Amino acid sequence: MRLVFAGTPETALPALHQLIDSPRHDVIAVLTRPDAASGRRGKPEPSPVARAALERDIPVLRPSRPNSAEFVAELSELAPQCCAVVAYGALLGDALLGVPPQGWVNLHFSLLPAWRGAAPVQAAIAAGDAVTGATTFQIEPSLDSGPVYGVVTETIRPTDTAGDLLGRLAVSGAELLSATLDGIAEGALTARPQPADGVTLAPKISVEQARVRWELPAPIIERRIRAVTPNPGAWTLIGDLRVKLGPVYLDAAVKPPGPLPPGAIQVDRKHVWVGTGSEPLRLGQVQPPGKKLMNAADWARGARLDPSVRAS
């Protein structure tokens, strides 16, 4: 099939490469978000998907208003049979959705109807789900509600960050998307409506929402930190210093101190503990402002934290 591929971040690259290399499909163009400021100088840089497409001599479409009449006409002139979407990053209007005769097929990183929205992987980890997956479905105007073509499942490991899990889903999801498009091209695949029950939402997580709330139970905090790693990144105030947090540990490998009030900090020779709404959590790595991630105990000793300083 003649395909237009819509995607923006690195997460979309496995699917893009799979479709470019497929002998059954022809990626005639890539649709991605406009170049965005990057680095300290704020120089506009193309998205990972744009860079990958340009390296393969595939035309790149970067409309600032993808639902404008002008862009709908531009896409229509390309005459795609189907459009494949992986993390494009913009809502698609009715006119745009009506361009390809086989519609728009989205790869979403959850087992729909669970975790509709921008942050499904983060939501699954934070909720303590044991299993998640990826779903291909026909895009409709309403959010992630279209009929489903196929799914693939993935176990959530106890130490998975959102980055870890998304990396695996991007690869398995690429296979699923390719198989889905093969089935559509053959006329052998029919989408089925999503169940009405089991709908949950996963809106984008803000930087403020990634701030650790130490009054919560330790297991919830541990999951939430993994859920926002690497982006937007967990953080806390230690005194008046804003510190990013790497992994935290709730295990039997190291004996924790006695009970600590939420936010209270205890430092020994090898470890840093912070009190929660239940048992203390052990910090693995921290990133003070302007520095790289470092061992939490090394940082705490060097910073000579006052015993009265708390995390908040």
Curated annotation (Swiss-Prot):
Belongs to the Fmt family. The gene is fmt. It comes from the Bacteria. Its EC number is 2.1.2.9. The lineage of its organism: Bacteria, Bacillati, Actinomycetota, Actinomycetes, Mycobacteriales. PANTHER family: METHIONYL-TRNA FORMYLTRANSFERASE (PTHR11138), METHIONYL-TRNA FORMYLTRANSFERASE, MITOCHONDRIAL (PTHR11138:SF5). GO terms for molecular function: methionyl-tRNA formyltransferase activity. It holds the Pfam family Formyl_trans_C. One of its GO terms (cellular component) is cytosol. CDD domains: FMT_core_Met-tRNA-FMT_N (cd08646), Met_tRNA_FMT_C (cd08704). This is Methionyl-tRNA formyltransferase. Keywords: Protein biosynthesis, Transferase. InterPro entries: Fmt (IPR005794), Formyl_trans_C (IPR005793), Formyl_transf_N (IPR002376), Formyl_transf_N_sf (IPR036477), Formyl_transferase-like_C_sf (IPR011034), Met-tRNA-FMT_C (IPR044135), Met-tRNA-FMT_N (IPR041711).
